[in-house]
């Protein structure tokens, strides 16, 4: 994958931080950081598609992360798709200004290191913060921590919900924290754009060696979070324009099309129980839309936590229904057992049972499958 961040946004961020640091004593700059690691292994246990599919993957196979084209292929134990290592560093310039960067090396991208975050934070008031640079798109509950395996119960997040062409953006966001009665609230508004060159997401549909750029421009959105005791709720709306550049065909950039996304999350943790639900709806002009949802229930038994998850994806198409790539539909039922080794490390075992109800193209290339994965996660 080539450069996946905006030079302009990073230069602006660095210039802003450098200018601020010149007005502060060098000794006042405080550097902190934390690392994270996931070592994962998986094996395909079965599936209905045999041999190399039309996109170059050896099947039976199963997608664990659409955004990174993380796919477990048949032929023994695979370590690449979900393994990763990363580091997040922060430089605090003064009480008002800090700068954060995060780099991640993924097995799904053959160890290539990408700069996922690079943003500055300026505290306007104790409740309000302006951030600028490169950040995660806040599409889901675990969006900000989706690279940190220790932060969530699964070996890999439910691919039916956590899987889109773009996961980051370059721009601005304004965070405001407050209270609504006894409830804590956070309002996050954001604007920006994303250009993802040689987008791995497109490999799944066009092939491992086929190059397509993805652009989301004129991004504007907001998310609102409420929390009280063991209840957390979240709603999100985002709109943008989207287009692709089919490099290998030589057709260039396609026309920009408007898209809208609505998301909602609910997290409940009464006593030792963990219950979560997420959904995302999309609408794209001259295309149709998508529906994605997942529901999980688990329970803590001291250091152990078993969990079951049902995740669904449905593609709703209103044009060009003869296109064999359209109308993708599938359900994944997963069983996870997590054991916390320490306060900063765990091991997990996950069994996925992927059931496909898609069009002939997707069914003949991916179909249904069973996948067993195990991981060791830690933060340091």
Regions found by a protein language model. Give the residues of each.
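Bacterial N-terminal signal peptides that target proteins for export
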Residues: 2-12
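N-terminal signal peptide c-region/cleavage motif recognized by signal peptidases
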Residues: 18, 23-25
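Transmembrane beta-strand segments of Gram-negative outer membrane beta-barrel proteins
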Residues: 28-67
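Signature for the C-terminal beta-barrel architecture of outer-membrane proteins
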Residues: 30, 60-61, 124-130, 165-304
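Outer membrane beta-barrel
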Residues: 30-32, 40, 74-194, 225-228, ...
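Flexible, solvent-exposed coil segments and beta strand-coil junctions
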Residues: 63-68, 94-100, 106, 148-156, ...
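Residues that define the transmembrane beta-barrel architecture of outer-membrane proteins
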Residues: 79-85, 112-116, 166-170, 216-220, ...
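Outer-membrane beta-barrel pore domains
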Residues: 121-123, 143-145, 235-380
